[in-house]
């Protein structure tokens, strides 16, 4: 029996949310003040986009599949870049790329939702 379409995306979204909660706890209880803001921002973006992956998982269009891939890559670039920057104490060179991917993902999601309405 095959898993339903999008179940991997939904599972990844749930894992992103779990990681985001752990990261927020780290930011709140362990990180130094200078790091906490970056870790907190990374956690907020990872959590929000984890929920988005769960919500978008049932959509079956090829555009929705592209959106899910862009969300994963965008979160990796944005949140991952912020975390790396916080740990290293440097800039976050991948954050703008990740953020741009997230913007494109949301614009494509809007297009997919507009074209298909509430149909899945």
Task: List each language-model region with its residue ranges.
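Interfacial loop at the N-terminal end of multi-pass membrane proteins
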Residues: 2-3, 26-43
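Transmembrane helix-loop-helix
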Residues: 5-9, 59-101, 107-117
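N-terminal signal-anchor transmembrane alpha helix
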Residues: 7-29
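Core segments of alpha-helical transmembrane spans in multipass integral membrane proteins
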Residues: 15-23, 37-62, 69-76
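Alpha-helical transmembrane segments of polytopic membrane proteins
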Residues: 40-46, 96-103
């Amino acid at each position: 029996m095959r898993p339903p379409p999008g179940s991997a995306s939904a599972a990844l979204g749930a894992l992103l949310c779990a990681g985001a909660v752990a990261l927020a706890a780290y930011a709140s209880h362990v990180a130094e003040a200078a790091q906490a803001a970056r870790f907190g921002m990374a956690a907020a973006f990872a959590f929000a986009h984890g929920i988005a992956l769960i919500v978008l998982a049932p959509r079956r269009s090829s555009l929705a599949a592209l959106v899910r891939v862009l969300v994963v890559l965008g979160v990796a670039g944005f949140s991952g870049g912020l975390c790396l920057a916080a740990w290293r104490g440097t800039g976050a060179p991948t954050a703008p790329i990740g953020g741009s991917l997230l913007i494109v993902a949301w614009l494509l999601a809007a297009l997919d939702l507009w074209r298909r309405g509430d149909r899945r």
